[in-house]
A protein has these predicted regions:
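Conserved beta-strand elements of the Class I
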Residues: 11-13
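Class I SAM-dependent methyltransferase "Motif I" SAM/SAH-binding loop
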Residues: 15-19
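C-terminal target-recognition/interaction regions appended to catalytic cores
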Residues: 209-330
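S-adenosyl-L-methionine
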Residues: 44-67
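Class I S-adenosyl-L-methionine
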Residues: 62-72, 84-250
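Short beta-strand element of Class I
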Residues: 32-34
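Conserved SAM/SAH-binding beta-strand->alpha-helix loop
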Residues: 39
Length: 330
């Protein structure tokens, strides 16, 4: 697919930006005006890959009025429980309450206050699949109600990236528009990805598990096997998709191990992790292996985001305030 230059790009902001996966997915269609990320190592990777970007830190200390106007808000926010004590007491007294009461003290509150102040045309929020069931489903219900209370029409879908990258990775995506647009999440085309196609041909010895680590993993798996459960390391199928890459991968790489025949298995390299998340090889990795494993384990799958971005922006052409977007040659 060839992408022509954007004539009049929409604008977006990137909250809880991590290393810029959401931005990477949206950049073909628009311009990022503002970025916020607290972790200093993620900031380093972000700035290395988006030259000229000024990444601000703690979003809780940034006044909403200081954030530039934008068309779309992007955020991969942390999953936190909401305290319902104050809400329950207000209900018992017959007092009205809104998102400020329900979400106070969480980072989701900062998303809400920015949406309230800036009123962008749309937003995309990303989180782990378990957000839907977190805290007996209370967390998710409050999130959706808060977004609707702010005047948005909300769409939700869990998407598994395993059709376009060789990794089983389910994430929940929440899309909202200020207008009742006919939005549908994209159906990902199954490209039959295979793990072997993202593996490097030459890998440094340091990625091979030491005898002590490998023996410990085997003992751990044996113990769980004797108890009748399937916990333990996973030897990845090179002809299929891997397990989900997590931020804990830096510990021992147990969830995705690569068979090396007679040698001990190895963990993925940082570059392989980047590929597993759909980042191009041009994406720079300036931090240590430990930090890079954490960063890619917390990242979004870029091609999934790009498909959602394409669907969102095309849908927004239907609205009252149309946005000029890229023309496509398939």
């Amino acid at each position: 697919m060839y992408m022509k230059k954007v004539k009049t790009p929409f604008t977006f902001i990137d909250l809880f930006a991590g290393i810029g996966g959401l931005r990477k997915g949206f950049e073909p269609y628009g311009e990022c005006l503002f970025s916020s990320e607290l972790n200093k190592y993620s900031q380093e990777t972000y700035c290395e890959n988006f030259p000229g970007s000024s990444v601000l830190g703690d979003i809780t200390k940034i006044d909403s009025k200081e954030i530039p106007d934008h068309d779309i808000l992007l955020a991969g926010f942390p999953c936190q429980p909401f305290s319902l004590a104050g809400v329950s007491s207000r209900e018992s007294l017959g007092q009205k309450h809104g998102f400020k009461d329900k979400t106070q003290g969480t980072l989701f509150f900062d998303i809400c206050r920015i949406l309230e102040q800036k009123q962008p045309k749309a937003f995309l929020l990303e989180n782990v699949k378990n957000l839907q069931t977190h805290d007996k489903k209370k967390t998710f219900k409050i999130i959706i109600r808060a977004l609707e209370e702010l005047g948005y029409y909300v769409n939700v879908k869990i998407i598994d990236a395993g059709k376009i990258v060789p990794q089983h990775r389910e994430r929940i995506f929440i899309v909202g528009f200020r207008e009742p647009l006919d939005f549908e999440f994209p159906e990902l085309k199954d490209t039959k990805p295979q793990l072997k196609n993202i593996l490097e041909k030459r890998v440094a010895k340091k990625y091979t598990l030491l005898d002590g680590t490998w023996n410990a993993l085997k003992r751990h798996k044996k113990r769980h096997g004797e108890k009748g459960n399937g916990f333990g390391y996973n030897m990845a199928n090179k002809n299929g998709v891997s397990n989900t890459l997590s931020a804990r991968y830096c510990k021992d790489g147990a969830e995705i191990l690569i068979d090396q025949g007679e040698k001990n298995p190895r963990r993925l390299t940082p570059r392989e992790c980047a590929r597993l998340m759909g980042f191009p090889d041009s994406f720079k990795i300036p931090v240590s292996d430990t930090q890079s494993y954490r960063q890619f384990g917390n990242a979004v799958v870029v091609p999934v985001v790009q498909e959602i971005a394409k669907a969102m922006v095309k849908c927004m052409q239907q609205g009252k305030h149309r946005i000029m977007i890229t023309d496509y040659d398939e």
